[in-house]
């Protein structure tokens, strides 16, 4: 027997009985007393088969009009009605609260990327991963994954396990007015940075030149390209580059305005030497600072948007100096988000001229 067969509940309500011919009159008399219940119609057609519940009460009438307790009318007398709520009625969290052991917390949030639901299950939840994956898949219709390892490679991808739905993890995700091709198993994507990406894209102007040494699948390169910028995009991860190229086609963007490279960042920046750049976007937080000194010497005074991690117990200005030999003004820094109890992501925004002035 399927455990989901036991996920049901009986709801006792008051309702008015009516024929199809008297439906309008009955509804009008009930008026403001018609009862509203989430995911259940206030007017139930007795002969209709509903996927989320079934009527247990026998009636010879065509309709049941749900009303609040205490409703009184001279012509229509409320009757007691029982509805059996089925598995399909309940939300994923309601189902899991019913079937998981009491000591196991129901996953309270998840990230949706295209056709994929990304959970981060803890130790106790992992013991019940298959049932959790099945329920979330049933309720969303999407593939369900959970992370089983930390980001530990140059591509910033992580080990994961499919616990519900189709194991194919290439998906199309919409962010704003752009569609992104994402191979979730092989590339890095963080929806939590969506608002930050929108802020950054708002700073680009048509005709400007963006250099993106760690472009990934293009969360910044593509918006810049769509705004009419000239874009130089690079990533060491070939799969990310393949996804970026697919996204350019999907969004019908002009490929003549973007040059794409599959090189190390150092090799890429060597190729860029001498080219006019208006914006450098550095988003490889563990290593972005390592490239600041090189960019500080860039001609033309480009703007630098550099994202990096720093532990909460460190002086961030001193940390930058220890990594780069550059002294920066605290006004150039902004906290983007807290990534762990002891680590923050920061953004450093300045120009190459100001970076040169900070040379130690």
From Swiss-Prot:
Superkingdom classification of source: Eukaryota
Transmembrane helix listed as a keyword: no
Subcellular compartments: Mitochondrion matrix; Nucleus; Cytoplasm
Key words, A-Z: Cytoplasm, Methyltransferase, Mitochondrion, Nucleus, S-adenosyl-L-methionine, Transferase, tRNA processing
Function (record text): Specifically methylates the N1 position of guanosine-37 in various cytoplasmic and mitochondrial tRNAs. Methylation is not dependent on the nature of the nucleoside 5' of the target nucleoside. This is the first step in the biosynthesis of wybutosine (yW), a modified base adjacent to the anticodon of tRNAs and required for accurate decoding.
Subunit structure: Monomer.
Name of the featured protein: tRNA (guanine(37)-N(1))-methyltransferase
Organism this protein belongs to: Encephalitozoon cuniculi (strain GB-M1)
The organism's taxonomic lineage, starting at the top: Eukaryota, Fungi, Fungi incertae sedis, Microsporidia, Unikaryonidae
Gene: TRM5
